Swiss-Prot record:
Gene from which the chain derives: atpA
Name listed for the protein in its UniProt record: ATP synthase subunit alpha
Binding locations of ATP: 169-176
Enzymatic reactions: ATP + H2O + 4 H(+)(in) = ADP + phosphate + 5 H(+)(out)
UniProt-annotated location(s): Cell inner membrane
Record keywords, A-Z: ATP synthesis, ATP-binding, Cell inner membrane, Cell membrane, CF(1), Hydrogen ion transport, Ion transport, Membrane, Nucleotide-binding, Translocase, Transport
């Protein structure tokens, strides 16, 4: 057999041209220990803080501790079958969750996966859970209200769009009830709502979802559930996931409201993770960065200006501002607001609504303590008519509390003091409100007008509730057009004052209660 050198060279060239090798560079590591949802990994030299690490079985862990010779990561989900020696690898991505209008009306877990049995979610994309908050230049001052429908809140501690208003109190004082009613009151306001349940019983979350559905508010709400049975990692990340879903609406020139229920349990979950990662404990065994845990979350709630929205949407949305309003909830122990986490969150937020167990147990619900409840920026966002008429309420209550304490020791009181005590009792009675009965701006205005201009003076204390019910019924039935107009504008002038006066005069002359 004779070999032709030309044929051989052609054959070699052909084979070289056809040769195709696929090389893949992967940053891999090996699990060296697994305990309590924390894995230690040898290798992964290029891993980033907060990066997702791919585990066997289509699961992920988040890198939190970057040490000299190992990486500490927290597993997102079940970890019982993970074992020493298993191979893991970097993904080059941080945690992202689905965002978009398709999530409205759905119940999802921390990772944005549906858990309500209603099928897949059509999302508009993904967003990182950790995002830097808008800068000072991108923000706009708070000057539009978020109506909660509660007389005590909207009159004394008003909330504005883009504000962070803390709801704080002991367990069983009506914190969740207040937040849920605020969500229900937004069903026709155009404000999208996100409810983040952290560390609660699954039955409690199911009850909240049912109540939202019954009152027609679920279609406008995303529920993010990280129940007590979920891992500490998912409870720690749930607020950030919910915030990313809310930012989708804010950045497109819309308004959103997010409730974190509650951040005390998130701090406990983060403390658990930090201690398992062997980070040094500080006050109350919390890690040193627990303040940053909440500040970086709550700073993302803001009102952004038109330029920010236009730049974000690449010119698709013009002339619109967006907002994300946050209602974080903190549970105190025996009314101690000077504990570590409560003081942190009070210092971060723009005000707090303090709910007191003594008031709650004495039948004053919502149990708002007007003495230490405050809204630092909401006053500029308050509806004109409510702002004008609510001025005397806080003063009346403050004077009443002071006199009531003094009256316990005094045997006989002069007429002026007795009159002031009677007025304070009636105002306190009038501010009581049942759950799931939010009031419109016009309804609140009529009630506040009655307080401000002495229409309650001749009404017995025991008849205040029936007086209020009859007054609202009379106003809505006989002056529906005026009430609708007042709800729309929220203005207050001499003409509106005269109309309100004629409504009250007509009611007292012709109605029985």
């Amino acid at each position: 057999m004779q070999l032709n050198s030309t044929e051989i060279s052609e054959l070699i060239k052909k084979r070289i041209a056809q040769f195709d090798v696929v090389s893949e560079a992967r940053n891999t590591g090996t699990i060296v220990s697994v305990s309590d949802g924390i894995i230690r990994i040898h290798g992964l030299s290029d891993v980033m803080q907060g990066e997702m690490i791919a585990l066997p079985g289509n699961r992920y862990a988040m890198a939190l501790n970057l040490e000299r010779d190992s990486v500490g990561a927290v597993v997102m989900g079940p970890y019982a079958d993970l074992a020493e020696g298993m191979e893991v690898q970097c993904t080059g991505r941080i945690l992202e969750v689905p965002v978009g209008r398709g999530l409205l009306g759905r119940v999802v877990n921390t990772l944005g996966q549906p858990i309500d049995g209603k099928g897949e979610i059509e999302n508009d994309g993904f967003s990182p859970v950790e995002v830097i908050a808008p800068g000072v230049i991108d923000r706009r001052s708070v000057d539009q209200p978020v109506q909660t429908g509660y007389k005590a809140v909207d009159s004394m501690v008003p909330i504005g769009r883009g504000q962070r208003e803390l709801i704080i109190g002991d367990r069983q004082t009506g914190k969740t009830a207040l937040a849920i009613d605020a969500i229900i009151n937004q069903r026709n306001s155009g404000i999208k709502c996100i409810y983040v349940a952290i560390g609660q019983k699954a039955s409690t979350i199911a009850n909240v979802v049912r109540k939202l559905e019954e009152h027609g508010a679920l279609a406008n709400t995303i529920v993010v559930a990280a129940s007590a049975s979920e891992s500490a990692a998912l409870q720690y990340l749930a607020p950030y996931a919910g915030c990313a879903m809310g930012e989708y609406f804010r950045d497109r020139g819309e308004d959103a409201l997010i409730v974190y229920d509650d951040l005390s349990k998130q701090a406990v979950a983060y403390r658990q993770i930090s201690l398992l990662l062997r980070r040094p404990p500080g006050r109350e065994a919390y890690p040193g960065d627990v303040f940053y845990l909440h500040s970086r979350l709550l700073e993302r709630a803001s009102r952004v200006n038109e330029d920010y929205v236009e730049k974000f949407t690449k010119g698709e949305v013009k002339g619109k501002t967006g907002s994300l309003t946050a209602l974080p909830i903190i549970e105190t122990q025996a009314g101690d607001v000077s504990a570590f986490v409560p003081t942190n969150v009070i210092s971060i937020t723009d005000g707090q609504i303090f709910l007191e167990s003594n008031l709650f147990n004495s039948g004053i619900r919502p149990a708002v303590n007007p003495g230490i409840s405050v809204s630092r920026v909401g006053g500029s966002a308050q509806t004109k008519v409510i702002k004008k008429l609510a001025g005397g309420i806080r003063t009346a209550l403050a004077q009443y509390r002071e006199l009531a304490a003094f009256a316990q020791f005094a045997s006989d009181l002069d007429d002026a003091t007795r009159k002031q005590l009677s007025h304070g009792e009636k105002v306190t009675e009038l501010l009581k409100q049942k759950q799931f009965t939010p009031l419109s701006v016009a309804e609140q205005a009529v009630i506040l007008f009655a307080v401000e201009f002495g229409y309650l003076d001749d009404v017995e204390l025991s008849k205040i509730a029936s007086f209020e019910t009859a007054l609202l019924d009379y106003s809505n039935r006989n002056h529906a057009e005026f009430m609708q107009e007042l709800n729309k504008t929220g203005n207050y002038n001499d003409e509106i004052k005269d109309t309100l006066k004629s409504i009250l005069d007509g009611f007292k002359a012709n109605s029985a209660w």
